[in-house]
Each structure stands twice: as C-alpha cells, then as structure tokens.
Amino acid sequence: MMFAQSLSNWLHRRGLHFSWVIVAVTFMTALSSSAALGLPGALLQPLSREFGWDVEQISSALAVRFALFGLMGPFAAILMERFGLRNVVVVALTLVASGMALATQMTQFWHLVLFWGVMLGVGSGLTALVLSAVVSNRWFDSHRGLVVGILTASSATGQLIFLPVGAWLVEHLGWRMAVVPVFVACAVMAVAVFLLMRNRPSDVGLRPYGALPGTEVLAAAPAMKVTLATPFRILAEAARNRVFWVLAGTFFICGLSTNGLIQTHFISLCGDAGLGPVPAASVLAMMGAFDLVGTIASGWLSDRYDNRKLLFIYYGLRGLSLLWLPYSEFTLYGLSVFAMFYGLDWIATVPPTVRLAGATFGKEKAGMVFGWIFAAHQLGAAVAAYGAGRVRTLLLTYNPALFAAGAACLLAAAMIWIIRKPAAASAVPPVQAKAA
C-alpha cells in the first residue's frame, strides 16, 4: 500500500530500515495473539463456577486449541507464501478477535470448543512462531537470531501486560469484561497490519536488512513453487534427518512443560494452594518479565554460541524448576525463585531451535520445517493441557503432572546431544547435512 511505501521512504531518508517497522508490527501482532491464548488459563475457575464444567472438560477444549494452533504451523508458511503475509495475518487476527468476542455469549460447552478451541486455535496458529521465522528470514540477512528472540519474547510481553489486568477484571467485573482488552488489541492490530505489513523487502524497494551493498533488489516472487502438498513433501524430506526428530521431540516437551502445563494450569494450581487469581497472575507476569529478558538474550546468544549447549542449559534449568515447584510451599519467596529460573528460559528455546533448523534445512525450507517442529510443540501442549486437567480431576493434585514434566525436560536436555555440532552447517547443503 502507498502508506507503507511512503513510511519506508521517510525512514530511508533518515537512515532507518523499514524492516524494523515489520518487526514492531509482528511483535504487537504476536503479543495480542498470545494474550488471547494465555487469558483462558485465568478463567478456568470462573467458567467452572458459572457453567458447571469441571477442569478436565475445559482443559479438553483448550487442548483442541493447542492442537490446531500447532497443526496450522506448516500450512501457515504455505499460506503466507501463496497469499502474502499481510492477508494471512489480517484473517488470523480477525478470527482471534471474533472468537474472543463470541465467547462472551456462549451458553453451551460446544460453544467453548468452537470459539476458544477452533477459532482461537486456527487464528493464533497463523500468527505463531512460524510468522517470526518467516519475517526474520525474509527481512533480515543479519541479526536473525536477535530478531527471532525479540519476536518470540512478544508472547511473554502479552502475558506480562494482559494476565494481571485480566485477573483483576475477573475478580471485580466478571470474566466477560476480562475478554474485552484482548478483543480490542486484536482488532486494532488487524488494522495496523493491513496498513503497514509488506510481504518482502522488495515490495518497498529495499534489500533485506544487513544485505551487502550492491546486492540486487530481487523481485517479489516465491523462492519455490508451493502447493498444498508442499508441507507434506517438506515433512517427508525432513523426516529422513535425525536432527528433525530431535528438534521435534524436544519441542514437544517444550510445549508440554510451558503452554500446556504452566500457562494453562498455573492459576488453578495456585488456587489449590490458597493463592488468589490476582497474585497468581502476578507471578505469571513476573515469569513473563524474566522471559522477555531471557528470550531476547537467547536470540543474541544463538547468533554467537553453540545452540546445542544453549538448549541443554534451558531444558535442564526448566526441568529442575518444575521438579522444585511442589516443594516451594507457594510462598512469595518460593514462587519468586520459581518465576525467575523458569521464566528465564520459558521461550528461550525458540531462537536456538530456529537456528538449528535453518542451518540444517536451508533458508527456503526453514519456515515449513519449523512449522512442523512447532506442530510437535503444540501437540505437546495439548497433551499437557488435557492430561494435567485429567490428573487434577482424578487425584485432586497437579503434583504428578509437575514431576512428569520436569523429568521430560531433563530428558530433552540429554536428547540435544544427539545432534552433531553444526560447525559448517550454513555452508553445507541440506542433503549433505543429513544424518547417517
């Protein structure tokens, strides 16, 4: 659109690159979407009280959301390739905003599954980590790890801003009013994306940020022919490489131990220990603050250090934190210690995982390959969202779920060493990088 071109020209005259506007818009988009994903975790008890649904029932609807959220990843990449970033993201934000708004009028359980399971799952899946991977690869030739770190940290920022506000609104004005800020944020961002988002740097006459001077500005055209079968073809190729299975397996555990368990059940878990929703949401916000720092730092580190070592540290630290949580006694001190150590690596696993996927499978395929890896992440989240709710219903405690997730994270830390050191990964064609 002319608005984006004019802004790009104005920035260029001042020595600024339009790619950072794309980063800002993507950051706010992911922030709004993540707020929509995180808010239902604060509404388990209010929904249970109003409609008589138990934790297991509500968790099953949220599990549908996580599953669709992840399964959209590979197809989000192809949709962005075929229809453009802007069109896909506008549709996605419209779905999320509509799902949030319609949920305020629900009266039946299937309404919850449709609005917060299907609509929220599909919409948020189109604006998930795959969007960050595509933006960083298309718009940047340098600082990709940092950009992925910044964009990934948006989910922590959304939690930091919206969860305490949402919990306060639930207590004072009811759960329906808690939905309003998230709906407004998604609606506003849909307009902003329509005005500012562009598909590639060449759309505004630019090279990717960091491209060498003299590099030709390439015409905006897909790098490879894509069809609906392309994600499955990419999956078949990636599945022959053990790096894919290690990254998918560890990311399954990542989703299981974060979105599915802590994001969904932490406020309910604290309620079992006698902690109200507002203090519990404040602890989640504290985790978000530490995660904001940890994820951006992880992006910076992933550009400079062995990403296997980073993932080993992140998964190990997370596993120990989860194993310790039941013994924290849920005091202010205990929860603060947990929030710090768990929060620092909540989503810090993403930049190293994206870097390893890109180094192994190449720039053009990295988006779709990471889409499948992210699908594993969200399937893990779905398993934990339902499984932890089931455990809570049957045993009246979340402790077995915490112990299982902690042990799984330690397993993920060990699995990382199956990957060979990618010393010259960027220079080795994907077919040669294939594991024996």
Can you annotate each of these PLM segments?
Residues F18-V55, G73, L261-I267:
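Extracytoplasmic
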Residues L31, G99, H111-L126, F252, ...:
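Hydrophobic core of transmembrane alpha-helices in multi-pass small-molecule transporters
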Residues P40-L44, A236-T295, A384:
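Extracytoplasmic gate region of multi-pass secondary transporters
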Residues L47-S48, L79-M80, I161, V165-L173, ...:
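Interfacial helix-cap and linker-helix signal at transmembrane-aqueous boundaries
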Residues L71-W110, S302, R308:
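Conserved MFS/SLC helix-loop-helix module at the cytosolic interface between two early adjacent transmembrane helices
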Residues W116-A153:
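Cytoplasmic helix-loop-helix junction between adjacent transmembrane helices
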Residues S154-V204:
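Helix-loop-helix hairpin linking two adjacent transmembrane segments in secondary transporters
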Residues P279, A285-D291, A297, S302-L356:
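C-terminal transmembrane helical hairpin of 12-TM major facilitator-type secondary transporters
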